[in-house]
Amino acid sequence: NAMDNTSGSAVARMTAMNAAGTALQTAITAYQAHVPITLTADPSTVERTVDSASIFGVNHRYAFNGYGSFDPDTMRVKDDFTALYKQVGFGSIRYPGGTISNLFNWKTTIGPRAQRLKQIHGFYNNPGQGGIEPNFGIGEIATFADEVNSEIVYVYSLGRGNAQDAADLIEYLNAQVGTNPNGGIDWAKVRADNGHPQPYNVRYFEIGNEMNQAWANSDGTASQGYWTTAVSGGSEQAYTEGGTASFTKQYAVSLEDWNKAASVSDGKAGLTRYMRYANVNPKMNGDDGAIVDDPSFVAVNKGSVSVWVGNDQSNEQWRIVDDLETAGAGDKVVQVDYSTGALRFGDGVHGAIPAKGQQVYVSYTVDRDGFVKISKAIKNTTDQINTAEQRTDGTRHTANVYTSYESTGFITRMANLNANQWYDGMTIHPYSGTPTGATAGAWYDDAMKKAETAGVNRVKEYVRLMPAGKVPVISEYGIFRDTSALVRSQSHALYIAKVALEYVRLGSPYIQKHCLIDWYSSGADSLGPTQQAVIQAVPEDGASTVTGEGRFGFFLTPSAYALQMLGNGIGDSVLTSTLGSTPTLGNGATSLSALVSKDDDGNLRVIIVNLDRALGRTLKLNFGQDLSGRVADVQTMDAAINAENTLENQDNVTPVDSSVTFDAATPTVTVTPHSLTTLKIRPRAAGTINAAPVITASDRTITVGDAFDPLDGVTAHDAEDGDMPLAAANVTADDVDPDTPGTYHVTITVTDSQGATTSKTFTVVVQAKEGGETPEPEPDPSPGPEPTPEPAPSPAPDEETDQAAHQKPDGKTNGQQADNGKTKLSHTGASVLVALTCTAMLAIGGGLIATFRRKRS
């Protein structure tokens, strides 16, 4: 029994020790949350310049009538969707999209709707996938971009196009009518005839989408390599340099639907099928002024074509003829159009008709252009346009061309080819991967850790590897692939804010979230989960998520509001800034980040992301100037981490606006847990006269041989800039000789940030020593420090749901009071730390002593 009692007592003591340790850690954490973290920035030090009007954008997809956002009857984007888009203020819009852009044929999406052709999905051979209506074409996206003031980022289809086609595109987008730099068809006039006389002035071009994801055995279902996987030397070399692609018994396709099931013979006369990766015909002017195919163009290599008809298990080769008119009714012959890649069969009178349900197979070779040739075509055509226009205002068209082949091998290959001048950067899609966790909190923490490992570090590595001057281009990012409802919640909004700040620092010219719109559902399609869209489309009665036709209800997710806050919260000049400390989550992910910038109107702009799920943070703003009296417009979004909006409750998660007038030169602001906060610190009111700095310096007397520092005891303060540091350069005159008795003078000069200069001269008397001895110093008559009164205790905050009530983004926190810009800790801070530290140490010490004594006895 004695042993049992002893054992039980030891367990009790260990339990008490653990509890004391937990209490100590809680106290330390509470203390740390109340101690201000200094955010330092120098408004005179610009780290990089951004286009704040366009940097935060979104990836949009033309398919399925823009996922329900486009009305094919009016041929315009729907008004209610446009209103939401404008509300967010997306700065740039990526078109025709990601994977879905890889086989986009732009020339067949312009002009009258009846003359357009259906487009081919990037994953065209998945079950149920068919041709895509070409309603939302180049003209339609350009009209929309003009209306909403967004910059177009164009993804060029390397899977379908070539250098000539790319050059024609640049003319269509950016040339003035009549310049026609490449001759042939005046594509600028075609644009004008289609209703847009002025150029679109597109300056960003991505060549393909994620074309490093090239899997040879999954063309049409999962691979984005297309013809590059059929080139000797591998897809990376093919993408970069082009080459001859060789195909053996590849099924031939319908012109407007490449799905295998849709490409079988219909058993009708005049069947025509196509070689998938033939070069697109560049077109020419016909005799009647119409645009027609160029019959001299070589779409596939002559003599390389063989054709079979049958099925995968059994098929028969058909003979190639130059003219079907010479064939008999039962002759199994086919005519090849080498200018388009078409395979034409007979009508039952001249040449046999492949039986209904049979597949057509074709072997062929084709010479394809790679990235380098296409980039040259884009940049050279841009130069030709500039030469032809002969502008006198100093402005010029620019064409920034980015590779979509995300690999270190591409970087090395371009350097070895001496071709670095032909790419301006690399598109990187740093998706998170799927977060894991049994609870919303665990999922959240893992997502924020993945934000660093996959979302940011991957980009940093490519920045390190690329040559100087090349930029990372973040045209898709986010939490992917995950169908959790949390992807539509506050959690994803904070993920976006966290990584976006780093992408700004890393130099991305535009940062585009994937994706603009998708169906509101609990699932996914071949392009990914629908939850990742920042605007959700809810189908109403009769609406189709297959075609995107019909009525949809639209609402903004918290992610959309995060992008709104980021876009409104950044200025063109990003400042170098640092945090005095970087708190972390339990898994090591950084939980606090900030970005400071300024705009052309003199506003200082601050974006703060606090990922901690339980603790607010207080930041002291040290911006090298006096902020007292300046007004800050504040926006905060701090909903619960699983909070989301719905069509019925669209305002469940929205930013909250407030304002604060700073009462200190270096004020403090407090941000709530799991929050995104922006501050727009306005300049002083118009009419405020810049005050000159004030120098405080007194005449001094020293004794021969004393050390002399002309800045000792000298201070300078400016009403706008605050305390001004002094250095040797501020001593503009100094004739003091500390070894020779006499009267001397020192002049101190300072200049504030707005150019106001002040000088002050003081006298220094050097006196001889008396009797060769140095007098004893006088005793200091000043009294000792006053004891600090014990602050009154304040109640400890409740759990996470009550944090917002206790901490406000107004420069103060409940339980705190401002004193010249300095924060006094409440009883929940330093006092609690001291009390609990003593209690914990006594408990731990008592437990150890008791255990030691028991062991001795």
Task: Map each language-model feature to its residues.
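C-terminal low-complexity, Ser/Thr- and acidic/Pro-rich disordered "stalk" regions positioned immediately N-terminal
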Residues: 768-827
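Extended beta-strand solenoid/passenger and fiber regions
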Residues: 237-349, 354-366
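Serine/threonine-rich, repeat-prone extracellular segments and beta-strand-based repeat modules
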Residues: 5-19, 721-762
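N-terminal catalytic cores of secreted or lumenal carbohydrate-active enzymes
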Residues: 35-250, 254, 366-421
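C-terminal membrane-anchoring or membrane-association module
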Residues: 837-857
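Aromatic/acidic polysaccharide-binding cleft in carbohydrate-active enzymes
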Residues: 474, 478-593
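Noncatalytic carbohydrate-binding groove/subsite architecture in carbohydrate-active enzymes
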Residues: 173, 246, 367-502, 506, ...
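Carbohydrate-binding surface patches
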Residues: 587-628, 634-638, 674-680
